[in-house]
Amino acid sequence: MVQSETSMEKYKNLSDFLKKFFIPSYVLSPEDEPEAQISCTTAPENPILVFINSKSGGQLGAELILTYRTLLNDKQVFDLEVETPDKVLQRIYLNLERLKDDSLASKIRDKLKIIVAGGDGTAGWLLGVVSDLNLSNPPPIATVPLGTGNNLPFAFGWGKKNPGTDRSSVESFLGKVINAKEMKIDNWKILMRMKHPKEGSCDITLKLPHSLPRIFPSDQENMEGYHTYRGGFWNYFSLGMDAQVSYAFHSQRKLHPERFKNQLVNQSTYLKLSCTQGWFFASLFHPSSQNIAKLAKIQICDRNGQWNDLHIPQSIRSIVCLNLPSFSGGLNPWGTPNPKKQRDRSLTAPFVDDGLIEIVGFRNAWHGLILLSPNGHGTRLAQANRVRLEFKKGAAKHAYMRIDGEPWKQPLPSNDETVMVEISHHGQVNMLATQNCRSKSMYESSSIIRFSNDEDDSSVVENEEF
């Protein structure tokens, strides 16, 4: 009872503003009794659960946890290095079900929101957990930019710079949560199958992101003779040189975490690695760098279920399957096709809830710098409801892939093995978006699209080499 009394004593001393977010302990844990919370009779207007990756942003994650726990009930603030979000949310929603006849708990369940602070991988992790719970009224999610790229927060108006961790900064963020609007976002499932590797062939020590776990043998999508991995992403899947640079960055950060405690230093290191990995000067430093067409056969499926081969120009060394208008720290690779292009190629603006994913190609980092110019964009390859990549035998020993900021080194077939990656639409979740939101919904009358004047799509580059 000591914890309950302490938490309610804190509630009594809170400002009216902070009381709008406070959740009584008995709602969060079955170990606490409601009688001890009797003074908290008014349901909070914006009850929140806060999930923070304490290792994100150098020391910022740990500092942010302390501030939130000082301002709110410490039981509603969770360190993702200590407890996983699936266990936390399952426990809380089971308790809310137990308290379904409690009017205060019911109101909190109906109004509940989530704040997640971390990199894009951390945010995607929370989104996936909420999606997997299949809740009748899933809580909308606000994202605190605590990583290096921060594409997810930027796409929904939360900024891309690491936040302050002091009381004033946190209260300012909470104020934005109150005024944020809900917006649906498409969820994309990724399924990867690898034929059982032979001794010494396809790498057995494969290290994949935690968001792409191996499925159980009893799963209906499991196939005998194959290792099958399934996960999801919300922003992008990429293949090629951009993922290779990201992999080098993550590898160095794991080896020397003390060197990566500042966002500006991280971005500078990333740029240096882009040069040394050959992303700028492939012909000079990495003449054997693989173009995508040599690595994989790619097929796309439209809304009508029609599969077609996707033509990839020989000069393309990186492709991105993109859901949000934010990549590599806020750039928009797809842009907005002009009306003529939309008619000629059946392209649309990049809505985040239309069940279509945009596929963009890049030749090199110089090509990527075009995104910094007005109306700049990558090579628009296609929009699709599903994408299938089949990797060719002997094309290369491995390829680099990345989902929502989490890269890995993928072994490729050498003999009769196969590697297949399939991306498909898999429902939606609710995000919280500020007035600075860059993402557009196909259902919003306010989604006015400004068309670019580009007449060329950067897709006529097959014979162009840097």
From Swiss-Prot:
* Gene Ontology biological process terms in this record: defense response; phospholipase C-activating G protein-coupled receptor signaling pathway
Offer an example of a GO molecular function term for this protein.
ATP binding
Q: Which cysteines are joined by disulfide bonds?
A: none
Any idea of its EC number? 2.7.1.107
- Alphabetized PROSITE patterns for the sequence: DAGK
Q: What class of enzyme is it?
A: transferase
- DAGKc domain residues are 43-194
Which reaction is the catalytic activity of this chain? a 1,2-diacyl-sn-glycerol + ATP = a 1,2-diacyl-sn-glycero-3-phosphate + ADP + H(+)
Task: Give the matching PANTHER family.
Answer: DIACYLGLYCEROL KINASE (PTHR11255), DIACYLGLYCEROL KINASE 6 (PTHR11255:SF82)
Q: Which family does it belong to?
A: Belongs to the eukaryotic diacylglycerol kinase family.
Complexes and interactors? Monomer.
**Protein name, per record:** Diacylglycerol kinase 6
Organism, per UniProt?
Arabidopsis thaliana
